[in-house]
Each structure stands twice: as structure tokens, then as C-alpha cells.
Amino acid sequence: MKALIILGLVLLSVTVQSKVFERCELARTLKRLGMDGYRGISLANWMCLAKWESGYNTRATNYNPGDRSTDYGIFQINSRYWCNDGKTPGAVNACHLSCSALLQDNIADAVACAKRVVRDPQGIRAWVAWRNRCQNRDVRQYVQGCGV
């Protein structure tokens, strides 16, 4: 019985751990997934966005009480428009995926959804953190020394 309790605690701790990317590790991953120059957006801008939205944390979430939506994952993609979390009223799910897919350590789904977001007229300006922290700023520091 004691072994089952310990096993349960170990499994629980594994499921709640998140991956927080190192800066250059994320830069290389985003480059490999085709983000550098996607829709004219530099890799440095994507890195700045991820830094200020999630701190490079794949499991970051942020509840928005005003519209009862939640932002998910490394890019803080919103459940009102882009994914289905089963609890956001009037959700659109334009990325056609579960919001839990945006919380995975493998960020391929998050990248695919971010690419979908920037195909809309707002582009990268859809992210408030990008507008406040990255727009019209020198963002080269986010990829400096990463060899990308």
C-alpha cells in the first residue's frame, strides 16, 4: 500500500512539472519549426514574445476573469478564439485543437497555432506583451549568442 502511495505521488509530480526552455534552446527549436521569418516576423521577435508572455514556460496559464477565457502555453494562446478548453463561453477554436495541446513540452502544436494567429489581420500585434515589450525595440538580444 505504501508503495502505491509513493508511486502515485511520483506520477503526480511528473504530470505537473513544466518545461521552461533555456533561451538558446528555444531559439533553436523555433528556428527548426519554421518560425524565423514566418509572415515576415523575425526569430528575435518570436523569442521576445515568448519571454514576456510565458518566461519560456510550456505550461504557463493565465485566467482572464473579464471574458472567462484562459491563455495557454509558451505563447499564451487564448481559449476565446484559438483553442478549446471546454469551459470558455462562446469559444471559436480557430486552431482546431484542445488547449491542453498548447501545454506540452513538445511545442509543435503551439507553434502551428501561433502561425495561425499571425495569419489573421492583426498578425503578431494580437499579443499584448509583444506590443508592450517588443514592438519598435531592438530584440536582437533574445537570440544573441545562440548561433541561429
From Swiss-Prot:
Q: List the disulfide bonds.
A: 24-146, 48-134, 83-99, 95-113
Q: Which GO terms describe its cellular component?
A: extracellular region
Entry keyword annotation includes Cytoplasm: no
**Which residues, by range, are in coiled-coil regions?**
none
Which terms are listed as keywords in the entry? Antimicrobial, Bacteriolytic enzyme, Disulfide bond, Glycosidase, Hydrolase, Secreted, Signal
Q: Which GO terms describe its molecular function?
A: lysozyme activity
Q: Where in the cell is it found?
A: Secreted
Reactions catalysed according to its record: Hydrolysis of (1->4)-beta-linkages between N-acetylmuramic acid and N-acetyl-D-glucosamine residues in a peptidoglycan and between N-acetyl-D-glucosamine residues in chitodextrins
Highest rank taxon of the organism? Eukaryota
Alphabetical list of Gene3D superfamilies matching this protein:
1.10.530.10
EC number assigned by the record:
3.2.1.17
Locate the C-type lysozyme domain: which residues?
Answer: 19-148
Q: Name one GO biological process term.
A: defense response to Gram-negative bacterium
Tell me the active site: 53, 71
Q: Which InterPro entries match?
A: Glyco_hydro_22, Glyco_hydro_22_CS, Glyco_hydro_22_lys, Lysozyme-like_dom_sf
* Signal sequence, start to end: 1-18
**Family under the similarity heading:** Belongs to the glycosyl hydrolase 22 family.
Q: Tell me, how does this one assemble? A: Monomer.
Q: Which PANTHER family match?
A: LYSOZYME C
Q: Could you tell me what this protein does?
A: Lysozymes have primarily a bacteriolytic function; those in tissues and body fluids are associated with the monocyte-macrophage system and enhance the activity of immunoagents.
Name used for this protein in its record: Lysozyme C
Taxonomy of the source species: Eukaryota, Metazoa, Chordata, Craniata, Vertebrata
- Gene that this sequence comes from: LYZ
